[in-house]
A protein has these predicted regions:
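Short, acidic loop-to-helix structural element flanking the phosphoryl-transfer center
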Residues: 53-85, 92-99, 125-128
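Short loop-to-alpha-helix "cap/lid" segments that border enzyme active sites
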Residues: 122-134
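Non-catalytic pre-domain segments flanking phosphatase-related domains
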Residues: 1-34, 42
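Short, basic/glycine-rich phosphate-binding loops at helix/coil junctions
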Residues: 44-58, 107-114
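Acidic, Mg2+-coordinating phosphoryl-transfer loop and its flanking beta/alpha structural elements
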Residues: 131, 139-171
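Glycine-rich phosphate-binding loop signature in dinucleotide/nucleotide-binding domains
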Residues: 24-25, 81, 134-141
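Substrate-recognition/cap helix-loop segment adjacent to the acidic, metal-dependent catalytic center
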Residues: 76-84, 90-118, 133
Length: 171
């Protein structure tokens, strides 16, 4: 695209949710995972115990999570010019609970990306695709926060500095 040329209008993917409406261009952004980074999902972990993992119940209970205050505080101190992208492998079916949770804690965010209906890919693959989509939208991913070491490695491979938050969920 040449300087001064209008950017083609992009349709927002269905599994993306803007906080205050879509932006014309992405800009500098910081990416936060939710479960284990912003939300304390520890009381839901029992749904994932062997021999039977109940992902449906695990995600359905996400609206009751406590806030991880120390990480949430980062949202308040980051420069206002940075866009906050919440990138979670939660399925779209729990978007209502997720949005209510974000409202309850009055968290700063610009874009929420959740796993689309019928997407059963591994979290790492889903988030890798999201990184590509964000860049195509014009986002400059400056930093990420993640509790899954596989996703941390993916961000690093993609040239995005990523801070590992130990949630204990993957021990």
């Amino acid at each position: 695209m040449q300087v001064g040329q209008a950017r083609p209008v992009q349709r927002t993917p269905d599994h993306w949710r803007w906080h205050d409406g879509p932006v014309d261009e992405g800009g500098p952004a910081v990416v936060f995972d939710m479960d284990g980074v912003l939300s304390d999902a520890s009381r839901r972990q029992h749904f994932l115990d062997w021999p039977r993992r109940d992902w449906e119940a695990f995600f359905a209970a996400c609206g009751d999570d406590a806030l991880i205050d120390e990480v949430a505080r980062l949202l308040d101190v980051l420069d206002d010019d940075l866009r906050i992208v919440l990138l979670t492998a939660r399925p779209l079916r729990v978007r209502t609970q997720t949005l209510a949770w974000l409202d309850r804690y009055e968290l700063r965010w610009d874009l929420l990306i959740m796993r689309d209906h019928g997407d059963y890919s591994a979290s790492r693959e889903f988030k890798l695709d999201a990184v590509d989509d964000l860049r195509a939208w014009g986002f400059d991913l400056r930093l990420a926060f993640e509790d899954d070491r596989r996703n941390v490695q993916m961000f690093h491979t993609q040239g995005v500095p990523c801070i590992y938050i130990h949630s204990g969920y993957y021990d």
